[in-house]
Amino acid sequence: MSQAAVVYWSGTGHTEAMAQAIAAAQADLFTAAEFDADKAAHYAAIAFGCPSMGAEQLEESEFEPMFEAVKPALAGKKIALFGSYGWGGGEWMRIWEDDCAAAGLTLCAESVICQDEPDDAALAACAALGEALK
């Protein structure tokens, strides 16, 4: 098991492609349904990825409940956020970053967002995010 994990939810495959680019830096890859607080305890660094859904929010049936459940186990860990969106300007990510700050979590790198399918620049930013988890 590596010291870093990448946990994501993807509806279209865009956020999954971002997760794979981040995990290429020797991180274990999990879907939101596969991850819980017990698994979080085994990692020093975790990147969480979720696309913007509905009215600029996290996916509500799988990802958000998982994230809320693991949040207490994230204190003192390197945390990073990423995701894709179809429209809007990325407000869901700013809300998510604020939620992490309110919970006392510190992000180890600037969050990575991209509109629709990640292009080469977004994939390069994801690779850099993966390196920041080391």
Task: Please annotate each region the language model reported.
Residues 2-4, 10-32, 37-134:
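FMN-binding flavodoxin-like domain, especially the glycine-rich phosphate-binding loop
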